Amino acid sequence: MKSSSNGLLAQVSIAHLVSHLHIMTVPAMLPLLPDAMQVSFVELGIAIGLFNIVSALVQAPLGFLVDRLGARRMLMAALLLGTVSFGLVAAFPSYPYLLAAMILAGLANGVYHPADYSLLSRGIPPKRMGRAFSIHTFAGFLGSALAPPIMIGVALATAPRWSFAIAAIAGLMAWAVMVIIGSPLPDKKQNNGVTEPRGAEARPITTPVMTLAVLTLLFTLLSLSTGAIEKFSVSALVQGFDVALPAANLALTIFLFASAFGVLAGGVLADRTDKHGYVAAGAFALAAFIVVLVIRMPLPPVALATALGVTGFLTGLVAPSRDMLVRAASPAGAEGRTFGIVSTGFNVGGVIGPILFGFLLDRGLASGVLWAAVGFMVATTAVVLLQERHMQMKPAPAG
């Protein structure tokens, strides 16, 4: 069982790494694409927003398809579709084709979270679930961290189209790995040794609507909080803080790598405490304070990279607890649907954020991008504290 669950975790984590590499492909090249494609930051924000609109529209229905058709089959199809989307813009590097590619990539992105978490929930023993979620999320954050140096490096050495080609090749390689290794789960109905009841796929979700709404709002705020830094901080630092592009890109890369290692630490923490709301609130409050320091104090490159690194570690720390909260709210056999619904919050934030942050950059309000990140972090802190208090006030189950 352990070897099969490890194989499952490896495959799902590789796919998650590629999905985040794809998410960050366009944002990583934001400093270069306006000149390369003769477009504004707002137009690029619209392209990123389109990706998220499509993902938001399809993620919940795709979650139902994941539970009905099989998570692994859907995951492999998503990897192929992502490969096609970035291959398209590599072949035809223009803004109209970028928009078309973002539609296809958004459709593929709508599969990843429902499929990944459905596979993990069915194939990982409960006692290892917190660490499994942290490894899976670490892989995604690692994909985000690899995007800036790879995409910017390839684009500067050759041309942006070859960065899109690299993204396409990564998707194809992940698909090939899944084909070669095969399925670690012999029975689609197997759920950690427990057979799902007949008709589980058609069972409606029983999670309270308010719980789903709060979790979706939390995902939205998390997307807005970290998205400002992940996708627009390099352009903001270069434009508004006179930071050289290599130094800004290094600071972002350290932020992303630190986020990934924060996830691993968060996995251990998630298995040792049930006070997930207080952990998240403390981490985001401290992260907001550090970003304020970045805005208000001129920092040399090393100090800037250190500050963003600590910020990244803190924001990564809460990810496994976030995933455990959603799994706890998911009825058995409906993990794909539940994660599909609440993960739309990422896409809602992904629609609002790029257009807002692109607008601020086009208006020369670069510091506004970082101030927005602070505001969304404070809002995230408030939401998780309110949710924690609500959970503590709920009566304990009888017996």
Identify the role of each PLM range.
Residues 276-322:
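C-terminal transmembrane helical hairpin of 12-TM major facilitator-type secondary transporters
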Residues 58-70, 263-275, 361:
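Helix-to-loop junctions at the C-terminal end of transmembrane segments
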Residues 24, 52-60, 144-145, 256-260, ...:
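Residue-level signature of mid-helix packing/kink "hotspots" within the transmembrane helices
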Residues 26-27, 210-256, 260:
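Extracytoplasmic gate region of multi-pass secondary transporters
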Residues 136-186:
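Helix-loop-helix hairpin linking two adjacent transmembrane segments in secondary transporters
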Residues 101-140:
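Cytoplasmic helix-loop-helix junction between adjacent transmembrane helices
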